[in-house]
């Protein structure tokens, strides 16, 4: 995964689900 999601501000970008998520894959 390259960087974080554009819409993800306080939450990290989950590369597995392709959405904002607090946890890591």
Curated annotation (Swiss-Prot):
Tissues and organs where the protein is expressed, per its UniProt entry: Expressed by the venom duct.
Coiled-coil boundaries: none
Compartments, record wording: Secreted
Broad class of where this protein is predominantly found: secreted
Cross-referenced PROSITE patterns: OMEGA_CONOTOXIN
GO molecular function: calcium channel regulator activity; ion channel inhibitor activity; toxin activity
InterPro entries referenced in this protein's UniProt entry, alphabetically: Conotoxin_omega-typ_CS (IPR012321)
Keywords recorded for this protein, A-Z: Amidation, Calcium channel impairing toxin, Disulfide bond, Ion channel impairing toxin, Knottin, Neurotoxin, Presynaptic neurotoxin, Secreted, Toxin, Voltage-gated calcium channel impairing toxin
Residue positions, PTM Cysteine amide: 25
Disulphides: 1-16, 8-20, 15-25
Cellular component GO terms, alphabetical: extracellular region; host cell presynaptic membrane
Function recorded in the entry: Omega-conotoxins act at presynaptic membranes, they bind and block voltage-gated calcium channels (Cav).
UniProt domain comment: The presence of a 'disulfide through disulfide knot' structurally defines this protein as a knottin. The cysteine framework is VI/VII (C-C-CC-C-C).
Family of this protein: Belongs to the conotoxin O1 superfamily.
Protein name: Omega-conotoxin MVIIB
